[in-house]
Swiss-Prot record:
Keyword Chaperone part of the UniProt annotation: no
InterPro entries the UniProt entry points to: Nucleolar_protein_12
Disordered: annotated segments: 99-138, 209-235
Keyword Cell membrane included in the entry's annotation: no
Sections of the chain in a coiled coil: 49-110
Location in or out of the cell: Nucleus, Nucleolus
Name of one Pfam family that matches: Nop25
Protein name according to UniProt: Ribosomal RNA-processing protein 17
Amino acid sequence: MAVHTNRQILTRGKNYATKQSKKFGTDEVTFDKDSRLDYLTGFHKRKLQRQKKAQEFIKEQERLRKIEERQKIRQERKEVMEEQLKTFKESLNLEAEIEDAKNDKTEDLQVESDESWHGFDSDKDDGDNDNNESSVKPILKKGAITEIYDDSTTVELETLEPNDNFEYLAQLNNVKLEKAEKVLKQSINRATKYAKFLGVDEKQKKKPRVKKFRYLTKNERRINQRKANDNKRRR
Protein backbone atom coordinates (compact mmCIF):
# COMPACT_ATOMS: atom_id res chain seq x y z
CA MET A 1 0.00 0.00 0.00
CA ALA A 2 1.40 3.34 -1.12
CA VAL A 3 2.01 5.99 1.47
CA HIS A 4 0.37 9.39 0.72
CA THR A 5 2.29 12.55 1.32
CA ASN A 6 1.02 15.46 3.35
CA ARG A 7 0.33 17.54 0.25
CA GLN A 8 -1.81 14.78 -1.25
CA ILE A 9 -3.83 14.47 1.95
CA LEU A 10 -4.45 18.25 2.07
CA THR A 11 -5.30 18.40 -1.63
CA ARG A 12 -7.80 15.59 -1.20
CA GLY A 13 -9.48 17.55 1.60
CA LYS A 14 -9.68 20.64 -0.58
CA ASN A 15 -11.25 18.67 -3.39
CA TYR A 16 -13.80 17.25 -0.98
CA ALA A 17 -14.72 20.75 0.24
CA THR A 18 -15.19 22.11 -3.28
CA LYS A 19 -17.30 19.07 -4.19
CA GLN A 20 -19.54 19.61 -1.17
CA SER A 21 -19.91 23.31 -1.93
CA LYS A 22 -20.97 22.54 -5.47
CA LYS A 23 -23.48 20.01 -4.23
CA PHE A 24 -25.30 22.50 -1.98
CA GLY A 25 -24.57 25.66 -3.99
CA THR A 26 -26.95 27.89 -5.95
CA ASP A 27 -27.68 26.82 -9.47
CA GLU A 28 -29.04 30.16 -10.71
CA VAL A 29 -29.31 33.76 -9.48
CA THR A 30 -32.39 35.68 -10.60
CA PHE A 31 -33.21 39.36 -9.87
CA ASP A 32 -36.66 40.85 -9.36
CA LYS A 33 -36.82 43.70 -11.84
CA ASP A 34 -39.50 45.61 -9.93
CA SER A 35 -37.59 45.42 -6.63
CA ARG A 36 -34.36 46.38 -8.37
CA LEU A 37 -36.06 49.34 -10.03
CA ASP A 38 -37.64 50.38 -6.73
CA TYR A 39 -34.26 50.29 -4.98
CA LEU A 40 -32.46 52.24 -7.71
CA THR A 41 -35.16 54.92 -7.99
CA GLY A 42 -36.23 55.12 -4.32
CA PHE A 43 -33.39 57.14 -2.78
CA HIS A 44 -35.52 60.28 -2.39
CA LYS A 45 -38.43 58.30 -0.97
CA ARG A 46 -36.22 56.61 1.61
CA LYS A 47 -34.71 59.97 2.51
CA LEU A 48 -38.20 61.37 3.20
CA GLN A 49 -38.97 58.31 5.33
CA ARG A 50 -35.84 58.89 7.40
CA GLN A 51 -36.81 62.54 7.89
CA LYS A 52 -40.31 61.51 8.95
CA LYS A 53 -38.91 59.02 11.48
CA ALA A 54 -36.57 61.71 12.83
CA GLN A 55 -39.50 64.12 13.27
CA GLU A 56 -41.54 61.44 15.03
CA PHE A 57 -38.59 60.74 17.34
CA ILE A 58 -38.26 64.45 18.15
CA LYS A 59 -42.01 64.71 18.86
CA GLU A 60 -41.81 61.72 21.18
CA GLN A 61 -38.87 63.26 23.04
CA GLU A 62 -40.78 66.54 23.36
CA ARG A 63 -43.80 64.69 24.74
CA LEU A 64 -41.66 62.89 27.32
CA ARG A 65 -40.00 66.19 28.27
CA LYS A 66 -43.41 67.82 28.85
CA ILE A 67 -44.49 64.87 31.00
CA GLU A 68 -41.34 65.24 33.08
CA GLU A 69 -41.91 68.99 33.47
CA ARG A 70 -45.49 68.40 34.63
CA GLN A 71 -44.21 65.89 37.18
CA LYS A 72 -41.72 68.46 38.47
CA ILE A 73 -44.46 71.11 38.70
CA ARG A 74 -46.68 68.71 40.65
CA GLN A 75 -43.81 67.93 43.01
CA GLU A 76 -43.10 71.66 43.54
CA ARG A 77 -46.78 72.36 44.22
CA LYS A 78 -46.86 69.48 46.68
CA GLU A 79 -43.83 70.90 48.51
CA VAL A 80 -45.43 74.38 48.57
CA MET A 81 -48.64 72.93 50.03
CA GLU A 82 -46.68 71.09 52.70
CA GLU A 83 -44.79 74.29 53.55
CA GLN A 84 -48.02 76.29 53.75
CA LEU A 85 -49.56 73.62 55.97
CA LYS A 86 -46.51 73.79 58.22
CA THR A 87 -46.72 77.59 58.45
CA PHE A 88 -50.45 77.34 59.15
CA LYS A 89 -49.77 75.01 62.07
CA GLU A 90 -47.10 77.41 63.33
CA SER A 91 -49.61 80.27 63.05
CA LEU A 92 -52.02 78.28 65.19
CA ASN A 93 -49.30 77.96 67.79
CA LEU A 94 -48.72 81.71 67.44
CA GLU A 95 -52.39 82.40 68.14
CA ALA A 96 -52.19 80.18 71.21
CA GLU A 97 -49.21 82.19 72.45
CA ILE A 98 -51.14 85.43 71.85
CA GLU A 99 -54.04 84.08 73.88
CA ASP A 100 -51.64 83.20 76.69
CA ALA A 101 -50.22 86.73 76.59
CA LYS A 102 -53.75 88.17 76.77
CA ASN A 103 -54.50 85.96 79.76
CA ASP A 104 -51.35 87.24 81.47
CA LYS A 105 -52.48 90.82 80.85
CA THR A 106 -55.92 90.10 82.29
CA GLU A 107 -54.28 88.62 85.39
CA ASP A 108 -52.17 91.77 85.78
CA LEU A 109 -55.30 93.91 85.46
CA GLN A 110 -57.02 91.83 88.12
CA VAL A 111 -54.07 92.35 90.46
CA GLU A 112 -54.28 96.10 89.87
CA SER A 113 -58.03 96.09 90.51
CA ASP A 114 -57.40 94.46 93.90
CA GLU A 115 -55.58 97.62 94.90
CA SER A 116 -58.89 99.51 95.18
CA TRP A 117 -60.03 101.75 98.12
CA HIS A 118 -60.95 99.81 101.27
CA GLY A 119 -61.68 102.61 103.71
CA PHE A 120 -59.74 105.26 105.55
CA ASP A 121 -57.00 102.82 106.51
CA SER A 122 -56.17 102.35 102.88
CA ASP A 123 -55.89 106.13 102.52
CA LYS A 124 -53.28 106.10 105.22
CA ASP A 125 -51.36 103.41 103.36
CA ASP A 126 -51.63 105.46 100.19
CA GLY A 127 -50.25 108.44 102.06
CA ASP A 128 -47.26 106.37 103.13
CA ASN A 129 -46.73 105.23 99.55
CA ASP A 130 -46.88 108.84 98.38
CA ASN A 131 -44.19 109.73 100.88
CA ASN A 132 -42.02 106.89 99.57
CA GLU A 133 -42.56 108.02 95.99
CA SER A 134 -41.69 111.60 96.91
CA SER A 135 -38.29 110.34 98.09
CA VAL A 136 -37.63 109.01 94.56
CA LYS A 137 -36.30 111.49 92.07
CA PRO A 138 -39.11 112.29 89.59
CA ILE A 139 -38.70 112.46 85.83
CA LEU A 140 -39.62 116.15 85.70
CA LYS A 141 -37.71 118.61 87.81
CA LYS A 142 -39.92 121.53 88.58
CA GLY A 143 -38.54 124.96 89.02
CA ALA A 144 -41.35 127.45 89.33
CA ILE A 145 -40.67 131.06 88.41
CA THR A 146 -43.53 133.41 88.99
CA GLU A 147 -43.56 136.91 87.60
CA ILE A 148 -46.34 139.42 87.99
CA TYR A 149 -47.21 141.51 84.97
CA ASP A 150 -49.51 144.42 84.63
CA ASP A 151 -52.48 142.24 83.70
CA SER A 152 -51.88 140.00 86.79
CA THR A 153 -50.89 136.79 84.88
CA THR A 154 -48.62 134.07 86.27
CA VAL A 155 -46.20 131.95 84.23
CA GLU A 156 -44.63 128.66 85.42
CA LEU A 157 -41.52 127.34 83.65
CA GLU A 158 -40.61 123.64 84.02
CA THR A 159 -37.29 122.17 82.89
CA LEU A 160 -37.07 118.61 81.56
CA GLU A 161 -34.35 116.42 82.98
CA PRO A 162 -33.77 112.71 82.14
CA ASN A 163 -34.36 110.23 84.94
CA ASP A 164 -32.13 107.15 85.28
CA ASN A 165 -34.40 105.38 87.75
CA PHE A 166 -35.94 102.81 85.38
CA GLU A 167 -37.68 100.90 88.15
CA TYR A 168 -39.66 103.98 89.13
CA LEU A 169 -40.54 104.72 85.48
CA ALA A 170 -41.60 101.11 84.89
CA GLN A 171 -43.78 101.21 88.01
CA LEU A 172 -45.48 104.38 86.79
CA ASN A 173 -46.18 102.78 83.37
CA ASN A 174 -47.35 99.46 84.88
CA VAL A 175 -44.41 97.56 83.36
CA LYS A 176 -42.71 94.61 85.06
CA LEU A 177 -38.99 94.58 84.38
CA GLU A 178 -38.72 90.93 85.47
CA LYS A 179 -40.77 89.83 82.45
CA ALA A 180 -39.23 92.28 79.96
CA GLU A 181 -36.74 89.82 78.45
CA LYS A 182 -39.35 87.06 78.20
CA VAL A 183 -41.86 89.39 76.52
CA LEU A 184 -39.17 90.59 74.08
CA LYS A 185 -38.30 87.01 73.05
CA GLN A 186 -41.98 86.16 72.60
CA SER A 187 -42.48 89.24 70.43
CA ILE A 188 -39.47 88.37 68.24
CA ASN A 189 -40.69 84.77 67.81
CA ARG A 190 -44.18 85.94 66.88
CA ALA A 191 -42.79 88.42 64.36
CA THR A 192 -40.56 85.80 62.68
CA LYS A 193 -43.38 83.26 62.50
CA TYR A 194 -45.76 85.83 61.05
CA ALA A 195 -43.14 86.84 58.47
CA LYS A 196 -42.72 83.18 57.47
CA PHE A 197 -46.49 82.82 57.21
CA LEU A 198 -46.66 85.80 54.84
CA GLY A 199 -43.71 84.46 52.84
CA VAL A 200 -41.55 87.55 53.33
CA ASP A 201 -38.34 85.67 54.13
CA GLU A 202 -38.66 83.18 51.26
CA LYS A 203 -36.84 84.00 48.06
CA GLN A 204 -38.72 83.35 44.84
CA LYS A 205 -37.21 80.46 42.95
CA LYS A 206 -36.47 81.31 39.34
CA LYS A 207 -37.34 78.50 36.97
CA PRO A 208 -34.60 77.59 34.48
CA ARG A 209 -35.39 78.72 30.98
CA VAL A 210 -35.95 75.77 28.64
CA LYS A 211 -34.16 76.08 25.32
CA LYS A 212 -36.51 75.36 22.43
CA PHE A 213 -35.48 72.87 19.78
CA ARG A 214 -34.90 74.20 16.27
CA TYR A 215 -33.37 72.90 13.08
CA LEU A 216 -30.11 74.37 11.81
CA THR A 217 -30.23 76.47 8.69
CA LYS A 218 -28.37 75.59 5.54
CA ASN A 219 -25.60 78.15 6.22
CA GLU A 220 -25.18 76.93 9.82
CA ARG A 221 -24.86 73.33 8.67
CA ARG A 222 -22.32 74.39 6.06
CA ILE A 223 -20.25 76.29 8.66
CA ASN A 224 -20.33 73.34 11.08
CA GLN A 225 -19.29 70.93 8.35
CA ARG A 226 -16.44 73.23 7.36
CA LYS A 227 -15.21 73.42 10.96
CA ALA A 228 -15.37 69.63 11.29
CA ASN A 229 -13.35 69.19 8.08
CA ASP A 230 -10.74 71.69 9.30
CA ASN A 231 -10.39 69.80 12.59
CA LYS A 232 -9.92 66.51 10.72
CA ARG A 233 -7.19 68.05 8.56
CA ARG A 234 -5.35 69.39 11.60
CA ARG A 235 -5.29 65.95 13.15
